[in-house]
Every structure is written in structure tokens, then in C-alpha cells.
């Protein structure tokens, strides 16, 4: 059995340990994950997926009064159906956190308002409750809505599908998150330079149920690896780890690097984007730099020396761990000599 989201082949022992075989269909479809103990945990939906569903429902409700559910194709390519409440151009969708109990945005309501555009064309307007960048960064200008590229693509695709289905020449859609500013205070946004609301994100469109069960799964995967392992923190890192280290077993560990390293016997590689890796190597890496994020630091003259210093210090502490830092295009930007 293979996870269509991560391409991970579940060991037969995990499948045999599952006491709820009826739930395995959700695992096959990517809607849930299977852990080493046989427990099935539901994936949740990202803020980007929730936003896309609300926008699509608002447009569809212009043509059919009420809308109770919509289909959304996620950035990972999987089509899902979400419950919505749409009526005459306004719709809401509540964020489903799945079995990720620590998701502070779980249950948050996303509201979209749509109106036909007489002049044609499609306009998407991020409104109240969606955060914006308080400072310029290498990828975002000050004041830009905090909506990631995969999430924005998902939203725009859902809007285009709804416009076609509703037979409209165009539309204007305004998306708001009524409690976004309040809930954002419980997230990392205030510390990473995003103000006024939450971020709308979603690399795959799902939220992983990262909890103690997932840690158990990571450790089990490391123990079962037939050879050397490469540990990575995210989806892009997983992709580039497989390309750079095809002979290694690539294992997605999220923010569980410390636990994963303890489970590794022998040599290991850490490969991925700089954010989590540098802060794992040195939680105070930003101290005294005047930067609030690693991405912001990467655009300063301090960057190259900081990367060299932190890699050397980490190598001295963990001589059997090789760290390879890549950018979003897969180029190696940091590696010990």
C-alpha cells in the first residue's frame, strides 16, 4: 500500500497491525496516514484548501442558491470533497484539522463573497483576517498577502472551475477570515513578520497529523531502512533528497530531527531547506542579526558566513551527520567542506 501524497510504501507489518481495515481505504486515497502501530490518523485540510472551497461555493451559489459541498483539486493532485454553506453569493467553510489536535486554526471559518463581473474577468481579493508581510523578504514585498503560491494556485483554479460551471463571464470574490487576526496571535506569524491575520498555506493541500504517533512512525522507518538514511523536513526537501541521494532511504521527519537523529545508527544525512535545519542546529541563529526569519537572513551579507559557521559547529558536535542545505530550486547552498 502506497501513500499517494508522500509516495511512501507502507510496510506490510503496519497494514497487518491495523485493527480498522475499513479505514484503510482512506489511507489508499491519501485522506489518512497509517502509523507503525496500525493506527489510522486522518489528514486535515490546509488553510489554502479551505479558502478554495469557500470561494468556489460562493460563486456556485450565484447560480443555484444553496451549495452544501464542493470538490477541490489539491496541489498534490488529489480531488477531495468539502462541506460548505453557500447561499446567493456568500459561502463559508470551516477548516477541518483532521486528527492534528494541535492545529490552532482547526474549526476556523473562512467566508467568501462573490458577485458577477459585468466587464468579464476574474478578480480575487484577500480581505480581513488574512495576514500580510510587515517587511520586505526575498520572496515577498511588504504588504503582500501571506498566501503561498500553491495555495493561491488552488484558489484560482477552484474559482475558474466555478465560473465555468456557473456559466459566468467573470466574477469578483472577496475572501475573509473573521477570526483570523485573533487566531494569528496563537501562531508563529507575529514572530515571522506576518501581521493582521493568519497565513493561507498548503504545499499539498493537506495538514499532516504530526503527533507522537508520527514520531513513532519516523523511528520505525529509520529502524527498517535497508541502508543509509537522509532525513528531511518538508516536501521540497523530500524531493531534492531523493534526487541528490538516490541510494539513501529518504525519510520525511518534519520538526522531529532530534528524535530522528537519536534513532539513527551510523552515518546519516540531513537535507532540506534552510529554515528548520538552521534553527535546529542553533535555535538562536537569528539572535543579533536584526532578522525575524531565516529567509530574511538569507538576503543579508551575514548569510554565507552564518551558514558556514553553523555547519562547522554542527559537524564538530555530530561528526557522523552530513548536512546539505538546498534552496527552493534544489541548488546546494550549504555543505560542510
UniProtKB/Swiss-Prot annotation:
Enzyme Commission number(s) from the entry: 2.1.1.195
Entry GO MF terms: cobalt-precorrin-5B C1-methyltransferase activity
Coiled coil stretches, renumbered: none
GO biological process: anaerobic cobalamin biosynthetic process; methylation
Record field: catalytic activity: Co-precorrin-5B + S-adenosyl-L-methionine = Co-precorrin-6A + S-adenosyl-L-homocysteine
Pfam family of the protein (one): CbiD
Pathway(s) of this molecule: Cofactor biosynthesis; adenosylcobalamin biosynthesis; cob(II)yrinate a,c-diamide from sirohydrochlorin (anaerobic route): step 6/10
Keywords: Cobalamin biosynthesis, Methyltransferase, S-adenosyl-L-methionine, Transferase
Entries under InterPro entries matching the protein: CbiD, CbiD_sf
HAMAP family with a match to the protein in the record: CbiD
Family to which this protein belongs: Belongs to the CbiD family.
Name of this chain's protein: Cobalt-precorrin-5B C(1)-methyltransferase
Organism: Methanoculleus marisnigri (strain ATCC 35101 / DSM 1498 / JR1)
Amino acid at each position: 500500500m502506497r501513500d499517494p501524497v508522500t509516495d511512501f510504501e507502507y510496510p506490510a507489518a503496519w497494514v497487518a497491525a491495523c485493527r480498522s481495515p475499513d479505514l484503510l481505504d482512506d489511507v489508499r486515497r491519501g485522506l489518512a496516514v497509517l502509523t507503525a502501530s496500525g493506527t489510522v490518523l486522518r489528514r486535515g485540510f490546509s488553510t489554502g484548501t479551505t479558502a478554495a472551497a469557500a470561494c468556489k461555493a460562493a460563486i456556485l451559489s450565484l447560480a443555484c442558491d444553496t451549495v452544501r459541498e464542493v470538490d477541490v483539486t489539491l496541489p498534490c493532485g488529489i480531488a477531495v470533497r468539502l462541506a460548505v454553506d453557500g447561499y446567493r453569493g456568500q459561502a463559508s467553510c470551516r477548516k477541518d484539522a483532521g486528527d492534528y489536535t494541535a492545529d490552532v486554526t482547526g474549526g476556523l471559518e473562512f467566508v467568501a463573497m462573490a458577485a458577477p463581473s459585468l466587464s468579464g474577468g476574474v478578480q480575487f481579493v484577500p480581505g480581513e483576517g488574512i495576514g500580510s508581510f510587515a517587511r520586505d523578504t526575498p520572496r515577498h514585498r511588504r504588504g503582500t498577502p501571506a498566501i503561498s503560491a500553491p495555495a493561491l494556485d488552488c484558489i484560482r483554479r477552484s474559482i475558474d472551475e466555478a465560473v465555468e460551471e456557473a456559466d459566468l463571464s467573470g466574477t469578483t470574490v472577496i475572501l475573509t477570515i473573521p477570526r483570523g487576526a485573533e487566531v494569528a496571535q496563537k501562531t508563529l506569524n507575529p514572530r515571522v513578520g506576518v501581521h493582521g491575520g493568519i497565513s493561507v498555506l498548503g504545499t499539498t493541500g493537506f495538514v499532516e497529523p504530526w503527533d507522537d504517533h508520527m514520531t513513532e512512525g519516523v523511528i520505525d522507518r529509520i529502524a527498517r531502512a535497508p541502508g543509509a538514511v537522509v532525513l528531511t523536513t518538508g516536501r521540497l526537501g523530500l524531493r531534492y533528497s531523493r534526487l541528490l541521494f538516490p541510494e539513501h532511504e529518504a525519510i520525511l521527519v518534519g520538526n522531529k530531527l532530534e528524535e530522528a537523529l537519536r534513532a539513527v545508527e551510523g552515518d546519516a544525512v540531513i537535507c532540506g531547506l534552510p529554515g528548520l535545519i538552521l534553527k535546529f542546529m542553533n535555535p538562536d541563529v537569528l539572535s543579533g542579526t536584526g532578522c525575524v526569519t531565516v529567509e530574511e537572513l538569507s538576503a543579508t551579507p551575514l548569510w554565507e558566513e552564518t551558514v558556514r559557521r553553523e555547519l562547522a559547529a554542527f559537524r564538530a558536535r555530530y561528526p557522523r551527520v552530513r548536512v546539505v542545505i538546498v534552496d527552493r530550486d534544489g541548488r546546494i547552498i550549504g555543505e560542510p567542506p
